[in-house]
Amino acid sequence: MVGRSLQGSNRIAGLAEVWRRSVTRLWLLACWLLTVNPANLTAQDSKPVKILVVVSTPTTPADSSAEIFLAGSLPVLGNWAPDGLLLNRQADGTYHGTFEVLPETTVQFKVTRGQWQNVERDADGRNIANRQVVAKPQPDGQPLRIEIQVASWAAEAAVQSTVVGNLSRHEFRSETLGNSRTIFIWLPPDYDQSDARYPVLYLQDGQNLFDRATAAFGHEWEVDETATELIEKNEIRPLIIVGIGNTADRIDEYTMTFDAKRNAGGAGRLYLSFLTDELKPWIDHKYRTAVGRQSTWVGGSSLGGLISLHACLQRSDVFSGCLAFSPSLAWDREQIVAAVSEPHRWPHDTKLWLSMGTLEGGTAESQAANTGRTARLAKLLEAQGLRPDVDLWYRSCESATHDEASWAKQFPAALKALRTVTP
């Protein structure tokens, strides 16, 4: 009865927090709107920008039943679900789709046939970077027209599993968040032959880490291959890696604050509560883990890197280090940078891998902005006492883009940087 009462209390608290978050988001949006001076806005500036995407698919069979989708970074585009926005087939064989966003919003997307196994590719069948467009108001309120030609599609045959080693999957229900997700647990090669306890690395976007068959964009991080190789070479001590699958609420869950420009975000505290108070105790109970903070790290890429930085800021009693690949530092006017800027804000004895590719962004300006933000954060942390390649591993990765293939290349060096798991 006590267990049920506690579960009920947690459930009620979780629902109350979700309600509070919704009210807070509306309040923050209202406050932001009140701060806008109407005198500084034209009618065009204040109206949403309609974007018309026109897709031609010369490699798709001339079949009126074929379905083409946009998968992208907005709720209307499915928050990267592969079947986000269904396009309408026209008489000329092209596919059209429209959606609206606030002016100057940056939108990233790809074209799919409803599954990531059937995502668009270049003419040689290789993966392409996310398409990106900035919503610029058009004369007379006309739609911003984006024309796309799909060069080829990924192979439509069933993708074979690429898992190396002992990987298990579990459906995990969070009472705090009120949703479920897949948890991927990778165990080191000697786990079944030993009674040792192992350090644990928690990584976001778990479906993209181990297996091309589950990876959202057709590429995985090759975490299992990398960890196996480094362990066998005795370059790192064996560890457990937990991949936390994302959900349709990814944007909200991976951000601590509401971003008025994107009209999203702010459930990060709930997500961290799920991670530290629900998932970690379950992992510690089910597996032979070394439970202390010195043996517990957290990491991720993009928004996953952002929430991992916040995890170390908010719960340094749990995590002693962070892997932040291409973190979304621009979120909510660089709120994370402001948080770290407070005197001695970065926790003592908490280490950090921080990397950003030089080609992350759709324009030269956005690429420079991303690398500039990351370099400024690294300098700020060095000024607070973090020593290069001792406490802070900052890397500007030449020609790296914002995708799994780039993060896979960076992962070996990042894993070796973990002093908690090296010999």
Map each language-model feature to its residues.
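Aromatic-rich carbohydrate-binding modules that target alpha-glucans
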Residues: 59-104, 114-136, 169-172
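A domain-start/cap signature at the N-terminus of enzymes
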Residues: 128-199
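Active-site machinery of serine-nucleophile hydrolases
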Residues: 210-272
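Primarily recognizes the serine-hydrolase "nucleophile elbow" in alpha/beta-hydrolase
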Residues: 292-339, 345
